[in-house]
């Protein structure tokens, strides 16, 4: 019964994925690689698959590929901007809210393979899950087709938003807080994961932001990255409210 359900889900994914790539004008060779890119850990757990078959390794790779691609784009587009400005712009483009915008533009969340529990609790519309799948897809595209194809994809899905300044409202609180700290000569900012709880398909992470060896705020999120953003947001708001850090 379980194997039949898995086969049906995989078959449905392969059909949808093939149609999606065709609509994007992209070619692919290894569909198994892309299946992994869209396999959430809850899907892997539901069908007792190898834990390394979920998309987190590809997410790790895709994150780096995105940073490189966006860095090259900004480097070429803004030849007179200093490194600090380019870094800030890149952070806005590759932060979670922006990745969700890109993913939703092409409805990538429709492709994500989820476990039953994650599906029921709204995982398909969860921002952290969508952004992770987007990064994993980029990682898979890089391995399967190379950096030139990733660039082509970015030209269609990412760069138009940047050129139209449609990401102005997206806030990367880690960058905001870092810039404030730097302007005040307050020392180094680090983040530390202090708690991880809940079942594998519905994890909750708690991180704290540390300034000059002192924890100044905490944040919770469905991923470590999200919890760090929430912690930075709290710290930044404390600063805006003129409370001592």
From Swiss-Prot:
Biological processes per GO annotation: mRNA processing; regulation of gene expression; rRNA processing; tRNA processing
Q: Per UniProt, where does Mg(2+) bind?
A: 59, 132, 135
Q: Which cofactor does it need?
A: Mg(2+)
Q: Does the keyword Magnesium apply?
A: yes
Q: What is the annotated localization of this protein? A: Cytoplasm
The residues covered by the DRBM domain are 172-241
> Where is the catalytic site?
63, 135
Ranges for domain RNase III come to 17-146
Q: What is its main location?
A: cytoplasm
SMART domains, A to Z: DSRM (SM00358), RIBOc (SM00535)
Q: What is its EC number?
A: 3.1.26.3
Its Gene Ontology cellular component terms are: cytoplasm
* Molecular function, one GO term: double-stranded RNA binding
Catalytic activity annotated for this protein?
Endonucleolytic cleavage to 5'-phosphomonoester
Q: How does it assemble?
A: Homodimer.
Query: What does it do?
Result: Digests double-stranded RNA. Involved in the processing of primary rRNA transcript to yield the immediate precursors to the large and small rRNAs (23S and 16S). Processes some mRNAs, and tRNAs when they are encoded in the rRNA operon. Processes pre-crRNA and tracrRNA of type II CRISPR loci if present in the organism.
What family is this protein classified in? Answer: Belongs to the ribonuclease III family.
Q: What is this protein called?
A: Ribonuclease 3
What organism does the record attribute this protein to?
Answer: Staphylococcus epidermidis (strain ATCC 35984 / DSM 28319 / BCRC 17069 / CCUG 31568 / BM 3577 / RP62A)
What is the taxonomic lineage of the source species?
A: Bacteria, Bacillati, Bacillota, Bacilli, Bacillales
Protein's gene: rnc
